[in-house]
């Protein structure tokens, strides 16, 4: 398990605007772990880099800060899940599921290959169907009681090229998708830097060109593209793609890719 300084992690997770503020905040005892409330007061202390942090006394909007990714996507792509049956692929603790519910989803299939990760409050919600130890790449329409019209994808250590064919089988015609594109799991091994981090904007651009082209081949139009407001593991920049299942699929973001990558690198240039 890779480790990171507490102050650096707090900064990367957006708790502070600068590294110096993060350092002072940690020293003041303002930073705690979301999971167990453990308080950190030594900026240089190294903790697992997947430790989710929050400010002391802060009430998180969703069960996971990761929910902010889908929140941004719904806003920038002007999407609605009101009254919809949806799938959260790679649900984990359920940040995306929580966003969907708070935005009026009628039913959410929370799918994950792992077990015992979904937040307790979501497990107890009658609108949530928890599907643990479920490998979505083998999913079939019959696995779901209702046909979903919206899906989110946030998976790790697997390419979207293994997820989209299954989603095409399951999703309703004209169904909408928000997919988190993680270049570190899409690029060739030779393109990935130290500690699994990709810093080269050209690699990001190449990955987005390849992934969006692949999505079209799998029957999804690519209608929107932006960058995730939160960096992924080890500080990787990640991207949000808006897809739609259509008979005549097309890539409508090709001309935007370079500009989106530039904005992302500008946003995270000091991180």
Regions found by a protein language model. Give the residues of each.
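S4-like RNA-binding module at protein N-termini
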Residues: 4, 20-79
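Conserved S-adenosyl-L-methionine
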Residues: 99-107
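Flexible, glycine-/basic-rich loop-and-beta segments that form/coincide
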Residues: 237-239, 243-271
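A short glycine-rich, Lys/Arg-flanked "PGG" loop and its adjoining helix->strand segment in the class I
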Residues: 161-178
């Amino acid at each position: 398990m890779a480790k990171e300084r507490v102050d650096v992690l707090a900064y990367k997770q957006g708790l502070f605007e600068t590294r110096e503020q993060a350092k002072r905040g940690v020293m003041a005892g303002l930073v705690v772990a979301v999971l167990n409330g453990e308080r950190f007061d030594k900026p240089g202390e190294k903790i697992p880099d997947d430790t989710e942090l929050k400010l002391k006394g802060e009430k998180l909007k969703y069960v996971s800060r990761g929910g902010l990714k889908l929140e941004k996507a719904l806003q920038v792509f002007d999407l609605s899940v009101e009254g919809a049956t949806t799938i959260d692929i790679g649900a984990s603790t359920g940040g995306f599921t929580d966003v969907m519910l708070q935005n009026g989803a009628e039913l959410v299939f929370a799918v994950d290959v792992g077990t015992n990760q979904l937040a307790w409050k979501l497990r107890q919600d009658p609108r949530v169907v928890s599907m643990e130890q479920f490998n979505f790449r083998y999913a079939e329409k019959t696995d779901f009681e209702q046909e979903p019209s919206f899906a989110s994808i946030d998976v790790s250590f697997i390419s979207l090229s293994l997820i989209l064919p299954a989603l095409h089988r399951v999703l309703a015609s004209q169904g909408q998708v928000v997919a988190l594109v993680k270049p570190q799991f899409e690029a060739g091994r030779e393109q990935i830097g130290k500690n699994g981090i990709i810093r080269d904007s050209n690699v990001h651009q190449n990955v987005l060109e390849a992934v969006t082209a692949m999505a079209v081949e799998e029957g999804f139009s690519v209608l929107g593209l932006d960058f995730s407001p939160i960096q992924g593991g080890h500080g990787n920049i990640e991207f949000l793609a808006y897809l739609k299942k259509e008979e005549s699929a097309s890539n409508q973001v090709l001309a935007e890719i370079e500009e989106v990558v530039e904005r992302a690198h500008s946003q995270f240039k000091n991180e």
